[in-house]
Amino acid sequence: MLSLLALAMMQLPQNPSPMTDSTRDHVRVESRAVAGAHHNLSVGTLLVPYGRMATRPLVVHFHGEGNLVETVIHRWRDNAAVISVVAGGGSDVYAAAIGSGEKFRQLLAEGQQKCSCVFRPIYLTSFSAGYGAVREILRDPLSVERVDGVVLADSLHASYETGDKPGPVVPADLDSLFDFAKLAAEGSKRMLVTHSEVFPGTFASTTETADYLLTQLHLKRKAIMRWGALGMQQLSEAHLGNFHLLGFAGNTAPDHLDHFHAIYDWLKKL
């Protein structure tokens, strides 16, 4: 767990937060071995649950401990194939790991060969720095055609136009994510974005990038007070077509990690 927490918070240098939280439960999903065949791929590891299926849902997840990723996703569907990619800390590391949309499409072909099945639907999920890979994949139109939905679990950051001081976000850092959000809002794709209140200080927080997406989509948040998965406290939401944005309380590392453990719930809401 500590190793995942360390990976989760390692991106660009950020201002350390002294904040702690003892209000919310921060329930954790316990990692377990998921029954199935594991295959090492050119990027990441593929889990194919036992039992033959001609068509099988696939989740490609970026950033998190492999067994725990599989456990969390199988709370959503226990027949789903899972490709888990753990590349280290920092969005640039994940962008480099996937490299390009072409490499992603090759990864899908490699996985389908191992599975002896067709992957459908195909969902991308990321936590924390993992968004770097998702952003690169969605910059490739042919890969966008293959991807049915995206979940960003407290996992969308950008640089500031003012460098390491708070200011406007760099639009180019969010270009492909915004384009996919538009497709989801129009109904042809599905997208769910969650964010905490963690404020890194030296690069745009998930709240600031969420606000950017909402502005570009001409959407406004609705303030709410609702219990979420695993004891999380939801404070806001916005919906348009198949695009969903959920805002949650919390500015501590455990609050950030909540979003990873709740990925099964985000997939249900997708």
What does each of the following model-derived ranges do?
Residues 249, 256-270:
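Catalytic active-site module of serine/aspartate enzymes centered on a nucleophile-bearing elbow/loop
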Residues 117-128, 150:
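Alpha/beta-hydrolase fold nucleophile elbow
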Residues 151-254:
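The feature captures the conserved acid-bearing segment of alpha/beta-hydrolase catalytic domains
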Residues 136-148:
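Conserved hydrolase catalytic core segment
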Residues 126-137:
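Glycine-rich nucleophile elbow surrounding the catalytic serine of serine-hydrolase chemistry
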Residues 1-10:
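Sec-dependent N-terminal signal peptides
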Residues 53-115, 231-235:
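Active-site machinery of serine-nucleophile hydrolases
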Residues 9-58, 231-233, 241:
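A domain-start/cap signature at the N-terminus of enzymes
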